[in-house]
């Protein structure tokens, strides 16, 4: 660390979640392949829970939607602003603009054409899923035939939900 400081690095920002764990995890490309395969294999509507700040995971969901001919509905708090900003900054890309649809337009599509991307409030999607499961979400209610696909590790603070 001292050597890095001498080289003129002012700050080091890193992600060390689960760094002390000995459990081997899949590579990001393997995760992306798994997301695409899971979405491809499901015939009904898919509700994906992701953290809003994980742009890599969101890109993987967009890529899987494009590969499987589905549309993505953004339902988390502020996720539309996050996605639009990330696209403008070239941190996210869409194969085509029609990939994203508004929640009010979901009824125009068959269930097998939809991925609902729930990122929740403050980037935590699990509470949004809970609301969907009890009919209190503003756009979506989980129904028979839906696949709820959690592509993040839920925070420990919400484990009781």
Question: What residue spans do the PLM features occupy?
Answer:
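Metallo-beta-lactamase
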Residues: 1-24, 148
């Amino acid at each position: 660390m001292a050597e890095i400081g001498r080289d003129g690095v002012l700050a080091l920002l890193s992600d060390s979640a689960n760094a002390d764990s000995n459990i081997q995890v899949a590579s990001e490309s393997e995760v992306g392949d798994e997301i695409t395969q899971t979405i491809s294999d499901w015939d009904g509507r898919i509700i994906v829970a992701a953290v809003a700040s994980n742009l890599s995971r969101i890109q993987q969901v967009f890529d899987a939607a494009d590969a499987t001919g589905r549309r993505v509905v953004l339902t988390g708090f502020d996720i539309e602003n996050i996605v639009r900003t990330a696209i403008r900054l070239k941190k996210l890309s869409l194969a085509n603009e029609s990939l994203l649809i508004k929640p009010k337009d979901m009824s125009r599509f068959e269930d097998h054409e939809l991925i609902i991307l729930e990122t929740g409030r403050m980037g935590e999607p699990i509470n949004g899923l809970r609301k969907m499961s009890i009919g209190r979400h503003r756009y979506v209610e989980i129904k028979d035939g839906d696949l709820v696909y959690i592509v993040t590790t839920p925070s420990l603070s919400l484990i009781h939900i």
